[in-house]
Amino acid sequence: MERTNSIEMDRERLTAEMAFRDSSSAVIRIRRRLPDLLTSVKLKYVKLGLHNSCNVTTILFFLIILPLTGTVLVQLTGLTFDTFSELWSNQAVQLDTATRLTCLVFLSFVLTLYVANRSKPVYLVDFSCYKPEDERKISVDSFLTMTEENGSFTDDTVQFQQRISNRAGLGDETYLPRGITSTPPKLNMSEARAEAEAVMFGALDSLFEKTGIKPAEVGILIVNCSLFNPTPSLSAMIVNHYKMREDIKSYNLGGMGCSAGLISIDLANNLLKANPNSYAVVVSTENITLNWYFGNDRSMLLCNCIFRMGGAAILLSNRRQDRKKSKYSLVNVVRTHKGSDDKNYNCVYQKEDERGTIGVSLARELMSVAGDALKTNITTLGPMVLPLSEQLMFLISLVKRKMFKLKVKPYIPDFKLAFEHFCIHAGGRAVLDEVQKNLDLKDWHMEPSRMTLHRFGNTSSSSLWYEMAYTEAKGRVKAGDRLWQIAFGSGFKCNSAVWKALRPVSTEEMTGNAWAGSIDQYPVKVVQ
């Protein structure tokens, strides 16, 4: 019977934890865990990663275009193998003018073709994260007091929120918008717009100031906000406020969850490839005011406990002259979408509870769903970034188990050999714990994510940029360093972006950094 229970717990991805209250009593908690991200992968995702890691232009150039053009050159000039041998052994042999001219034209044509078709670099010039005014700060105790005094919650759900808040990993200096902290709460369109304007304009003002770029110079604008989509759109709000140019290409992404920030980066990357000599601005945020839940469905109350106010603005460029002043270049973006599966699609779902109150429900399967999406994303990304030795060891282990059905211990690639820094979406303490365990990361690697969760809470799609800002504020970014951003959110989606530092980022570059004035207080000890 004990063996059967163990199998069932493993199948359902459950973990038992025991805590002792006193000498005579103990508490056993059962919670879901992420799947082992690297021991159960599919060859099709490895194949996808290998395919994406190969540059099509380079392959065509060396395998088709270069040999074909060389053959044509030989036919046109009458060069033979004997002529090449004579040229090699006897430097006195001279080529006629027509042959020299043909060779020169050939080399110029091939070089021009290669340069014209190779991938254009996209630079991250700089970014800014919004830091609300001190009046918007709220401690864990203040949040719980506000929750209890509101009158919308039962005693059971108040206690539930207290348990979650004490274990979530948030500190006492996160931020909530005025509409929620007002007595009584003012959850209306006016307050929601005020929150959106404060966050977006605050981040953009800082970005334009630190980069010296004028709003009129921006040719592409992308805004992502999952749960607040007014008319006119948030992107139109920005265009109007900064009086941007009339031919600006603006996009407003809604409903795409916490992973939408990297979707915006990917969209900007593709648009910059099609629009030379351009600047693109990405604004990632979430709006809390109209999405606070005043019901008693526990699956919807989780969002109240972890989501907080925040946003970020990012400036991208494809102008080669901007390389010297830019901080990073974009190396890879990998997007994984599991929405074809009903369980994945429904695990984060906005709906009405039994009393008609709207909220966002987080299903019990969220941990396993996130793990599966992350596993697929990592398997696809691996061949693009891992050293060849790690790829070979991983593939050999995978083939032995999948094709030959051998019972061998799976080889877990060391992603620390591919990246110096990790920015993992600060969605919650439990997810960070499991990702650290499965990727075998040190506390130092997880520090930006854990400290961001503690200082700012879950700011949705912008959390990755608070983490990058933390890494910079600590003076850890050196030229050539590789940084991995991992985001996951509703749909269910998991997205990765890989950046390479073009220069060291000095701790003196703290203008617009949300950690300015408090970075020396971190890291702090957080709930484990």
Swiss-Prot record:
Organism the protein comes from: Arabidopsis thaliana
Protein name: 3-ketoacyl-CoA synthase 1
Keyword Transmembrane tagged: yes
Induction of expression: Repressed by herbicides such as flufenacet and benfuresate. Down-regulated by darkness and low temperature, and up-regulated by salt, drought and osmotic stress.
Disruption phenotype: Plants have thinner stems with an altered wax composition, and are more sensitive to dehydration.
Tissue spec: Ubiquitous. Expressed in siliques, flowers, leaves and stems. Barely detected in roots.
EC number(s) given by UniProt: 2.3.1.199
Reactions the enzyme catalyzes: a very-long-chain acyl-CoA + malonyl-CoA + H(+) = a very-long-chain 3-oxoacyl-CoA + CO2 + CoA
Metabolic or biological pathway, per its Swiss-Prot or TrEMBL entry: Lipid metabolism; fatty acid biosynthesis
Predominant cellular place of this UniProt entry's protein: endoplasmic reticulum
Topology class, membrane: Multi-pass membrane protein
Keywords tagged on the record: Acyltransferase, Endoplasmic reticulum, Membrane, NAD, NADP, Transferase, Transmembrane, Transmembrane helix
Membrane-spanning parts: 59-79, 95-115
Gene Ontology biological process terms from the UniProt entry: cellular response to cold; response to cold; response to light stimulus; very long-chain fatty acid biosynthetic process; wax biosynthetic process
Cellular component terms per the entry's GO annotation: cytosolic ribosome; endoplasmic reticulum; endoplasmic reticulum membrane; membrane
Residues covered by the FAE domain: 114-403
Covalent S-S links between cysteines: none
Function of the molecule: Contributes to cuticular wax and suberin biosynthesis. Involved in both decarbonylation and acyl-reduction wax synthesis pathways. Elongase condensing enzyme mostly active with saturated fatty acids, especially with 16:0, 16:1, 18:0, and 20:0. Mediates the synthesis of VLCFAs from 20 to 26 carbons in length (e.g. C20:1, C20, C22, C24 and C26).
Gene Ontology MF annotations: fatty acid elongase activity
Regulation: Inhibited by K3 herbicides such as alachlor, allidochlor, anilofos, cafenstrole, fentrazamide and flufenacet. Strongly inhibited by metazachlor and mefluidide.
Subcellular location per the Swiss-Prot or TrEMBL entry: Endoplasmic reticulum membrane
Active site per UniProt: C258, H337, H421, H425, H454, N458
